[in-house]
Swiss-Prot record:
Keyword vocabulary terms for this entry: ATP-binding, Glutamine amidotransferase, GMP biosynthesis, Ligase, Nucleotide-binding, Purine biosynthesis
Record-listed E.C. numbers: 6.3.5.2
Sites where the protein binds ATP: 235-241
Reactions performed catalytically: XMP + L-glutamine + ATP + H2O = GMP + L-glutamate + AMP + diphosphate + 2 H(+)
Name recorded for this polypeptide: GMP synthase [glutamine-hydrolyzing]
SUPFAM superfamilies in the record: Adenine nucleotide alpha hydrolases-like (SSF52402), Class I glutamine amidotransferase-like (SSF52317), GMP synthetase C-terminal dimerisation domain (SSF54810)
EC top class named in words: ligase
Gene Ontology molecular function, alphabetical: ATP binding; GMP synthase activity
Pathway participation: Purine metabolism; GMP biosynthesis; GMP from XMP (L-Gln route): step 1/1
UniProt-listed PROSITE patterns: GATASE_TYPE_1 (PS51273), GMPS_ATP_PPASE (PS51553)
GO terms for cellular component: cytosol
One Pfam family hit: GATase
The species this protein was found in: Alteromonas mediterranea (strain DSM 17117 / CIP 110805 / LMG 28347 / Deep ecotype)
Record HAMAP family: GMP_synthase
Length: 525
């Protein structure tokens, strides 16, 4: 590879905003590599990372409070452009000699910003033109404090009626601050603003593309594992599937995939995984039929957390047994992605908020002698999907709705039985089939069916029946942290209900879940 795709890089310092990962995803979309670190990173770490620009995120705290987060002084001494977003702008102003005050009017939600002075950051960006000829921007605000006095050397470049310094910059040092959130879609020109910062102000090149990421990953896999054998637990989910395709392209037959059919998958899913990866793509894949083992292990267990643990532990046991049969295996591959590994490891003081502390290895023995290969470790989910398309995986598979790790184990309420799983599989398949037929599948964020272990009276022909109940669940959400129930058409719901009751012997009633998150969770267990 002639160009190192990591050479052009932006550093994002996290001050605790719920939108921080979104900033990183936007920078990646622009085509530039970036990393997300805790706000209290050391000077040495910044020097070693050697960014071409730094972005300071928003955050929930107040700059005016003692002990609130601050950017390292070196951020403003490194000689690279800096963009402060919301709290990031406030701490920039405070640290460089300006003033920040609590505002008598808190701004949350839509606002219109007036551009009052030209700058490289807001150049040629407008949503409308005001009566005075000034550019107006539709933006998303989320702040209580505001910059009351800008630091020496800065100029105000935008304002709102209640926020006189909605954006500021220091032309000489190329420091910029915006009180709004350019990373969210509600800020209509936010992507253009970030692009102008990353490409025009920081002078980055667009090296971070799907094709380049694949080429880089393949080179690194080859360099790491050489001619040695790699094992991968293939689930058929997005992350493990893309990992499998990357490894297959890099090392071919030296990859062995182990697919564990635990009896908790969707209708025909196990056969589809084998057909796609074994027959179509030619991967070396071992199928383990472990339905009986898993169902035996789950007998008598009703508590959702105990079910999850039982399923996870049994999977590790089955996988370890299969791995031990493979001679000369030196490496274990996993589909760990970037949000899994973002944590407070970069926190020098221990004060930084943990975004997420997680590792995909959970449950593997500590004395495991296999080395670890994680080719997706730097990637966000949307990037994984893009390179999956580039590698030839089908769109419908990459953009399927989320499916929980324990599978139907948490969609059958209470104790798991084969009868319940078989009924649920068929009902869920009808629901999903009808969503596709009505062109509704991609319009909802997640849809599935839940088996309720209660019987209900019904009538079929002239006969009374006393059978099981299922619930349909469909939600709309951006981040899965909050969700609204999807307002699917009544005629559609009626059709799905009629098909399930008429086609599946054993189900007498279908209900629709109209709970939002909060207070309910998306999954029932």
């Amino acid at each position: 590879m002639t160009t190192n795709i990591h050479d052009q890089r932006i550093l994002i310092l996290d001050f605790g905003s719920q939108y921080t990962q979104l900033i990183a995803r936007r920078v990646r979309e622009i085509g530039v590599y970036c990393e997300l670190w805790a706000w209290d990173v050391t000077e040495e770490q910044i020097r070693e990372f050697n960014p071409q620009g730094i972005i300071l995120s928003g955050g929930p705290e107040s700059v005016t409070e003692e002990g609130s987060p601050r950017a390292p002084d070196y951020v403003f001494e490194a000689g690279v452009p800096v963009l402060g977003v919301c709290y990031g702008m406030q701490t920039m102003a405070h640290q460089l000699g300006g003033g920040v005050l609590g505002s008598d009017k808190r701004e949350f939600g839509y606002a219109q910003v007036e551009v009052i002075k030209p700058s490289p950051l807001l150049d040629k960006i407008e949503d409308a033109i005001g009566d005075n000829g000034a550019a107006l921007l539709d933006v998303w605000m989320s702040h209580g404090d505001k910059v009351a006095a800008i630091p020496e050397g800065f100029e105000t470049i935008a304002q709102t009626a209640s926020c006189p310094h909605a954006a500021m910059y220091n032309e000489e040092k190329q420091f910029y601050g915006v009180q709004f959130h350019p990373e969210v879609t509600h800020t209509r020109q936010g992507m253009r603003l970030l692009t102008q910062f990353v490409m025009d102000i920081c002078k980055c090149e667009k090296l971070w593309t799907a094709g380049a990421i694949i080429e880089d990953a393949i080179e690194r896999i080859k360099e790491k594992v050489g001619d040695e054998r790699v094992i991968l637990g293939l689930s058929g989910g997005v992350d493990s599937s893309v990992t499998a395709m990357l490894l297959h392209r890099a090392i071919g037959k030296n990859l062995t995939c182990v697919f564990v059919d635990n009896g908790l998958l969707r209708l025909n899913e196990a056969d589809q995984v084998m057909e796609m990866f074994g027959d179509h793509f030619g991967l070396n894949i071992i199928r383990v039929d472990a339905e009986g083992r898993f169902l035996d292990r789950l007998k008598g267990i009703e508590d959702p957390e105990l079910k999850r643990k039982a399923i996870g532990n049994e999977f590790v046991r089955v996988f370890d047994e299969e791995a031990s049969k493979l001679e000369n295996a030196k490496w274990l591959a996993q589909g760990t992605i970037y949000p899994d590994v973002i944590e407070s490891a970069g926190s020098a003081t221990g004060k930084a908020h943990v975004i997420k502390s997680h590792h995909n290895v959970g449950g593997l023995p500590e004395d495991m002698e296999l080395g670890l290969v994680e080719p997706l470790r730097e990637l966000f989910k949307d990037e994984v999907r893009k390179i999956g398309l580039e590698l030839g995986l089908p769109y419908d598979m990459l953009y399927r709705h989320p499916f929980p790790g324990p599978g139907l184990g948490v969609r059958v309420l209470g104790e798991i039985k084969k009868e319940y799983c078989d009924l649920l599989r068929r009902a869920d398949a009808i629901f999903i089939e009808e969503l596709y037929a009505a062109d509704l599948y991609q319009k909802v964020s997640q849809a599935f069916t839940v088996f309720l272990p209660v019987r209900s009276v019904g009538v079929m022909g002239d006969a009374r029946k006393y059978d099981w109940v299922v619930s349909l669940r469909a939600v709309e959400t951006i981040d899965f942290m909050t969700a609204h129930w999807a307002h699917l058409p009544y005629d559609f719901l009626g059709k799905v209900s009629n098909r399930i009751i008429n086609e599946i012997d054993g189900i007498s009633r279908v209900v629709y879940d109209i709970s939002g998150k909060p207070p309910a969770t998306i999954e029932w267990e």
